[in-house]
Curated annotation (Swiss-Prot):
PANTHER family: CADHERIN-RELATED FAMILY MEMBER 2 (PTHR24026:SF133), FAT ATYPICAL CADHERIN-RELATED (PTHR24026). It is found in: Membrane. Residues 40-139, 140-252, 253-359, 365-478, 479-582, 574-693 form the Cadherin domain. GO terms for biological process: cell adhesion; homophilic cell adhesion via plasma membrane adhesion molecules; retina layer formation. It comes from Danio rerio (Zebrafish). This is Cadherin-related family member 1a.
């Protein structure tokens, strides 16, 4: 039981270890962050139009797992919030499942998740709902009833219509119109502010008409909705009651006041109209307007009509929001200042996206920029001759745009790539090699500026034209790596051999090519430096029999020293300018019947067929005795002539000597020939006798017998050679032993044949001569026929090898031996030393050398 528990515990620890290791090695998946402009990634900062239909695939979640495991995607929302999206867990495709309304919710927070088998990563991202023109202007104070005193002056504002469009941009701007001028001939409305006033020259008459009904139309600026341009409007009815005037402080009509300055406005434009009336409806007083504070000189107001006018250009305004205090003062008919009232008019400076990006040069707007520069500038260098500025006069996001350069290849790059309002444009070199004068002498690029976040996507283009100047960046190049030429021998000096051509794509002086030749075979040739024509030296004499092959190098070089090489092979073609010449030694021949004789002629021409010779017999008497081999020159008897008897039967000549006229003719064109007289003495072979002769004659019929005999002789010679070599080797080994001291015993000379001597001193009895028997190459022993032969000397051991083994130094000859050698050399022909003494000296020298050898080993 205890062992079972221990086994279970060990298994548990092992499983825990594997889980721990597996957990350590498993990494969590992650999303790709491709930025807000991408359609795949983690949905961060995704912009989605509110008019996107349900069921649209709006995005693709995209991520990966470091271990390569499959991942699943998910989308969740805050508890209780509406779920707008659904995601496919495997593909990551996100689908819109609910309608969007930016006015209700302009930002949706989403929890996107990515998970593998063990880990899950959740990220909170925001999806921004972009506006579409789907909202109508909504009146804030309509329909309404307005009381207007009948003594209200013409041009006075009587009401401010307010309508709000919850859309943004141009779709959220509101302009006002009266539906029909016939229904309200006495009134006019400001299109931007919505202020309704009495038309100039018109007045109200309480007695004639106490009520006026006006239909006001509010229209937005239009925008994109479901892919189409759409303008939306609303209408409402304003009822104007004309009342009699009464005595009361002024009352501003239509407060609060909001006015807008658009960038298209100019000085003098009416920005807003304030309107105040006297509270005394039955007997109202005159009201005058003034600006109390907050205008900063940028605005002015008409004191009677209340019209606020712009004094500056919108670009010169220092602020985006102005809060202006307007004062309305009652003036009595006598001109006395009475009661007054103040109100605040808020004026905002509104930017419209009505300016596309514009490129500027040094002298103003410009859409073509030209530059002249050398080819192959350094990579990373900016084009200094281009002074380009780009500007968008709009504000905020309306002035944000991208820069892009379009042209051949990726030679240039523009910096910066994203601009807000204004930037200096810099163009950098990215691919210097592509900017090649030889490929194109000018380059044209399009510089594009395209707005990013605006519906209009205004853009601008400018042409950049670069004129390239040539540099010496190319070496001359031959049309071929080698040239093969043939020229006949005996061509006169100055003859053209071959023309070489090298091209340098550079222009002007850089494209000028000069030619030269060099090399061991160029001695007899010249080249025209400008044309590349190779010709022979004026003194050159070409002879194919002397030299038929030449090769050398030709060099093409531009003015800066850039060059290339080509090899020229010149073959001197042979002309048939030598006739055949007979060998004088072959003109007298003795012919044995059955064996041919050969004559030979030599043609000194260098090439075939000029040096190929054909032999023929031109004349022979009689002409039916000889045949000649046309190729080899072998002359032989006719096959039927097999004995001297047949020869003598053919001719009356008893001396058997013929003179044959033979012609040697070459095969050149034109052909040369030479004739000569060949004297042929015909004889018959002497028959051989004996068994050996009989054997050889029989072997002619059976050559294998002859080959067997030759093989046997060779084997016997090899065997004898091995035996002799073995005997010599054994004798040398015995002679190399150290022998005891010897005494020379003088003996009387005995008559003995010279061949019985067993030492190297030999004496020829027929011819007196001296033999060099000094095995150490230092002592010469001379012997003559007179005086008489010396007695037998002791047998000398064989000499030491004349060369030491590899790696051993030679032993020097002892002094005694050297002294004897010196003396003996001086008397090479007169030797007075006794042969016995000479033998003793040689033995002494040998012992000394053997002793030295023993000491060394």
């Amino acid at each position: 039981m205890k062992n079972a528990r221990e086994i279970q515990f060990s298994s548990f620890l092992l499983l825990a270890h594997f889980c721990f290791v597996g957990a350590q090695s498993d990494y969590a998946p992650y999303f790709y962050d491709n930025g807000p402009n991408s359609n795949n990634g983690n949905m961060a900062l995704l912009n989605l139009s509110e008019d996107t239909p349900r069921g649209t695939q709006i995005y693709v979640l995209n991520g990966t797992d470091p271990e390569g495991q499959p991942v699943k995607y998910g989308i969740t929302f805050e508890p209780g919030s509406k779920e707008f999206f659904r995601v496919h867990p495997k593909s990551g495709v996100v689908t819109l499942i609910e309608d969007l309304d930016r006015e209700a919710q302009d930002e949706i927070e989403v929890f996107v998740s990515i998970s593998d088998s063990l880990n899950k990563v959740v990220e909170k991202v925001s999806v921004f709902i972009m506006d579409a023109n789907d909202e109508r202007p909504q009146f804030q104070n309509m329909p309404s009833i307005v009381d207007v005193p009948e003594n209200t002056t013409s041009g006075s504002s009587i009401y401010k219509v307010q309508a709000v469009d919850r859309d943004t941009g141009s779709g959220g701007s509101v302009t006002y119109f009266l539906q029909s001028s016939e229904q309200s001939p006495k009134f006019a409305i400001d299109h931007h502010s919505g202020v309704l006033r009495i038309k100039p020259g018109e007045s109200l008459d309480y007695e004639k008409s106490r009520t006026h009904f006006i239909t006001v139309v509010a229209k937005d600026g239009g925008g994109i909705y479901k892919g189409k341009q759409q303008v939306m409007s609303s209408s409402a009815t304003l009822t104007i009651n004309v009342i009699d005037t009464q005595d009361s402080p002024p009352i501003f009509i239509g407060t609060p006041y909001f006015g807008y300055v658009y960038e298209v406005s100019s000085p003098g434009s009416e920005i807003f109209t304030v309107s105040a009336k006297d509270g005394d409806m039955d007997n109202p007083n005159t009201i005058i307007y003034s600006l109390d504070s907050g205008a900063d000189g940028s605005f002015s107001i008409n004191k009677t009509s209340g019209v606020i006018t712009l004094n500056l250009y919108p670009a010169d305004l220092r602020r985006e929001v102005f809060n202006i205090k307007v004062k309305a003062l009652e003036i009595s008919p006598e001109g006395k200042r009475l009661d007054f009232a103040t109100t605040t008019v808020t004026i905002r400076v509104v930017d419209l996206n009505n300016h596309p990006p514009t490129f500027y040069g040094e002298n103003g707007p410009q859409n073509v920029f030209e530059l002249t520069m050398y080819e192959h500038p350094q990579e990373g260098e900016f084009l200094r001759g281009l002074k380009i500025t780009v500007n968008d006069s709009d504000q905020g996001s309306n002035a944000k745009f991208n820069l892009r350069l379009v042209g051949p290849g990726r030679m240039l790059r523009v910096v910066p790539q994203t601009v807000l309002n204004e930037a200096q444009v810099t163009v950098l070199v990215e691919d210097s090699a592509a900017m090649d004068f030889e490929k194109s002498q000018f380059l044209t690029f399009k510089l594009l500026a395209v707005e990013i976040d605006t519906p209009e996507r205004f853009s601008a283009t400018a042409d950049i034209i670069i004129h390239l100047l040539d540099t010496n960046d190319n070496a001359p190049k031959f049309t071929s790596d080698f040239y093969i030429a043939r020229i006949p021998e005996n061509s006169p000096g100055g003859s053209n051999v071959v023309s070489v051509t090298a091209m340098d794509p550079d222009s002007g002086i850089w494209g000028v090519v000069k030619y030269s030749i060099y090399g061991s075979g160029a001695d007899i040739f010249l080249i025209q430096a400008d044309s590349g024509i190779i010709y022979t030296q004026p003194w050159a004499s070409l002879d194919a029999e002397v030299k038929s092959k030449y090769n050398f190098y030709v060099k093409a070089e531009d003015p800066e020293g850039k060059y290339s090489l080509a090899e020229v092979f010149v073959t001197i073609t042979d002309l048939n300018d030598h006739p055949p010449a007979f060998n004088e030694n072959s003109l007298e021949q003795t012919m044995v019947i059955g064996a041919p004789v050969k004559i030979e002629a030599i043609d000194e021409d260098a090439e075939e067929p000029n040096n190929l010779i054909e032999y023929s017999i031109m004349k022979a008497d009689p002409d039916n005795i000889f045949d000649i081999n046309a190729d080899t020159g072998e002359i032989k008897l006719k096959p039927y002539i097999k004995s001297m008897d047949i020869v003598q039967n053919i001719t009356n000549q008893r001396d058997c000597t013929w003179s044959v006229v033979v012609q040697a003719k070459d095969r050149g064109s034109p052909s040369f020939s030479t004739t000569t007289v060949v004297k042929i003495d015909i004889t018959e072979a002497t028959p051989l006798k004996g068994p050996l002769t009989s054997f050889f004659m029989n072997s002619r019929e059976n050559p294998m017998h002859f080959l067997g005999l030759i093989s046997g002789v060779i084997l016997i010679l090899v065997f004898v050679t091995v035996i002799i070599s073995t005997v010599i080797f054994v004798r040398r080994n015995k002679a190399n032993r150290i022998l005891p001291s010897r005494r020379i015993i003088r003996k009387k000379r005995k008559p003995q044949k010279q061949d019985d001597f067993q030492e190297p001193f030999r004496e020829e009895q027929e011819i007196p001569r001296a033999d060099n028997v000094n095995f150490n190459n230092n002592i010469k022993v001379c012997s003559h026929r007179t005086p008489p032969s010396p007695p037998n000397a002791p047998v000398m051991p064989p000499p030491l090898p004349s060369h030491c083994r590899h790696g051993e130094r030679e032993w020097t000859v002892p002094t005694v031996s050297a002294s004897v050698a010196s003396k003996s050399k001086k008397k090479s022909h007169r030797c007075k030393d006794n042969p016995v003494n000479t033998a003793l000296v040689s033995e002494l020298k040998l012992k000394l050398e053997q002793k030295n050898m023993a000491n060394r080993y």
